[in-house]
Amino acid sequence: MKTFAHSKEPVALVTGGSAGLGRALVTALAEAGWDVITDARRESRLRDLPPGVTAIAGDITDADHRAAIAVYVAQRGRLDLLVHNASTLGPTPLPRLDEVSVDDLQSVWRPNIGAPLVLTAELLPQLVASGGVLLSISSDAAVEHYPGWGLYGASKAALDHITLQYGAENPGIRAYAVDPGDMRTDMHQAAFPGEDISDRPLPETVVPAILQLIDSGLPSGRYRAAALPVRELVR
């Protein structure tokens, strides 16, 4: 394993960075000069990330994988941003709640709630020391009610609560749950099999609002990306 001197650049860990919003966010952070660590289950999808991004293949629900991530963070000597992006939609077609089994529940809640809860706990000392940002990618399904979205939506509602609870218990950090809105991603397509989702915006269009929130100093809370003002860049 490569040994790193303590990083002089801000350090970000973004889970699930191989595709969709995670990949777009990893790319933008790296281009902005952040020292970025990310992970994904499929190693093949991590090979063409931007130069300088540290990519770790593995399942975020696996304790050994999380321990490996923690080693990479410790080598940097700091953690300024922790983004919980990795998640699963669950069984498709999306089931009604009365069709959800205990196995379905566990398969969704372990990556969507359990892993973020314990990974945050494992990395909390570094995040608190830096006065960093804890940011979880939420969904409007966490607060609205759509047929078939109950299992996934409940997991995101729980993730919102966990995220903001960490903020309440650790006032030295800022904690954000962010609803990015509908996006043109593989996960969104899986939720609407056979439908044309080409009218949905690309994940890259959401990233500026998220980056501005990270930099804003706004109080901990739940935010919609579409409602966040984005400053025009002056070139």
Cite the ranges covered by each PLM segment.
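Catalytic loop of short-chain dehydrogenase/reductase
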Residues: T88-L89, R96-V102, G131-A158, T163-P171, ...
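Conserved glycine-rich cofactor-binding loop
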Residues: S18-A19
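C-terminal helical subdomain
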Residues: I173, A177-P180, T185, P193-R235
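Rossmann-fold cofactor-recognition segment
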Residues: P50-D64
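Conserved glycine-rich Rossmann-like NAD(P)H-binding loop of the short-chain dehydrogenase/reductase
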Residues: A32-D48
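Active-site loop of short-chain dehydrogenase/reductase
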Residues: E9-P10, R78-D80, L127-S138, P171-R174, ...
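A short, exposed helix-loop element centered on a Lys and neighboring polar residues
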Residues: T120-A121, L164
